[in-house]
Amino acid sequence: MHYFDTSFLAPLVREERSSTRVGRFMAGLPTGELAISRWTEVEFASLLARDVRMGAIAPDEARMVDALLEDVVLQSFIVLLPSGDDYERARHYLRNYETGLRAGDALHLAIAGNHRAKAIYSLDKTMIKAGKILGLPVSAGIRMG
């Protein structure tokens, strides 16, 4: 299973500098092995809400992007539900203070780790660094820059 955090998923449905590279990378992965979590969906909704609040996009545009994400997820992704074990593992990761993790990123890593993801993809440099410290198979998957 290949797990994706919100930073990697967002460029699939909204225009970002990494959109083309992310799309190309995703097209080369085996179907049926792509996963996100319910937390990813919540975090993405928060991203859109922040963009609306800051005036970066209109509410109607946010609704369209959100609907597009729902379609992409429905067609291509397994959606994992966080469990009590995931929260416990996330707390354990957060107690490793050298990682610099925030709660949401720790939860992504815990969910992916508990589901034995072959790869965890993120465009968040801090999360990638933390995942490597924790011995997890985290990578950007694409050239960042």
What are these regions (language model features)?
Residues T6, D105-A106, D124:
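Conserved glycosyltransferase catalytic-site signature
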Residues M1-T40, D51-M64, G145:
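Short, well-structured N-terminal submotif of metal-dependent ribonuclease cores
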Residues T31-L34, F77-I78, N114-A119:
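Short active-site oxyanion
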Residues M1, D71, L109, N114-G145:
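Acidic, PIN/NYN-like endoribonuclease modules and their adjacent C-terminal/linker elements
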Residues T40, D86, H108, T126-M127:
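Alpha-helix capping/helix-boundary segments
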Residues E41, E70-Y97:
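Acidic catalytic patch
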Residues I36-V42, G104-L107:
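Aromatic- and histidine-enriched alpha-helix N-cap/loop-to-helix transition segments
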